[in-house]
Amino acid sequence: MAMSTLALVVALAALSMASSQQQPLYSEYSFNPLEHLAGIAPYFEPNDPAREPSPPQGCEVEKVAYLVRHAAIDANDFDYETYLEPFTDKLKNTTVDWSKIPGLSFLANWTPPKLEEQELVTRSGKLEAAQLGVQMSFRYPKLRLPKRVWASTAERTVISAKGLIRGLETDENQINLVQIYEGKESGADSLTPYKACPAYSSSRGSEQSQTYAKKYTAPILARLRSYAPHFNWTVSDIIGMQEWCGYDTVGNPISGSLGYGWVNATQQLLSSDDNDDQDIYVSFTHRELPPTVLVTLGLFNNSDSTGANDINATMPLDKVNYHRQWVSSYILPFLTNIAIEKMNCTGSYGYQNQTDPTYYRVLVNRSPQTLPDCHDGPQESCSAAGFRDFVEEKGQMFGDFAGACGVGYDNSTNVMSFYSSPDNGTIVGKKH
């Protein structure tokens, strides 16, 4: 009896200790700073929302179009010259003995990564581009390999496209690469339409960013200054330090007009019944275009659920809105990709008797997204008629590229038409 009592006491003590240290059974959360670096985050799939990326039951993908940001680069010129290099130069010239400061002692022996040339795709970036090509081949095993892949003419987009081609093709010289000139008078007929848009400014939002940066870095600066008061820490130092670990604009009224060209061209490509067309369309661009396409599609809209369409209220300058939908690190890492799939859902329960079994859905980094006002298909996909109406409605809102951009040059166009060009591009071949 005494032994039973002792066992009970021991068991209760163990239970009490376990309760005080209780952890959720299925918690997988861990903070990874590389997933919070906005446009310089390495490619990852946040699975947001947490939905199955495979086609809905009874549906098969018949065609697909991808818009892909180039793979990881060493650094762009602006970031390197504004933040990265000034911080490392400051470190070289300081007399502070970092080895005697416990919290910052690593700086005594820290050597920054060698960036031989800015703007160039890294070795890991080339590998990730090839992996995306392999992933596509497994994801769409029944679709024909594309005849052509498109890329803007910058070296980093071309190299990224070549990497994907090498991962996607099964034999050498099957897929050609078509380069689309990054012109300043191309109108919407380009993979860099923002360069042909006089109203576009890459520095838009800088004032707001600087306002928030001062608040965000204030406690960090206070802590670092207490560690090393003679170093003259600045806001730019904090940004530079965080950028060395691993590049955001909101509320631009012309975004929808910049992104509509690709959305409209893609709808026409995927809905075409021409047997000579491709099954897979892949286009490489820079980080500026994918966010504008998401705006055109109405995705990750912070103000959508409020009905107020007050963008500024959803992105305050004095705190983090942790409930926001627009999270740059999730939607704009290197190699970020937006896919629009055309599906045949004749075998999907509840949809077998539809006159048109064709449905469309959008994926962002493999995560399925629901289009606002068009979710009448399996797993909230969009019917063919609904998608056509959706794109037409967006055209009424965003279809006037020349007007929205204030174009002053001749021969501008509101249409992205290079996909129908007879240019077959050039062979990429294997890298030996």
Residue ranges and their predicted role:
Residues 1-22, 432:
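Fungal secretory targeting signals
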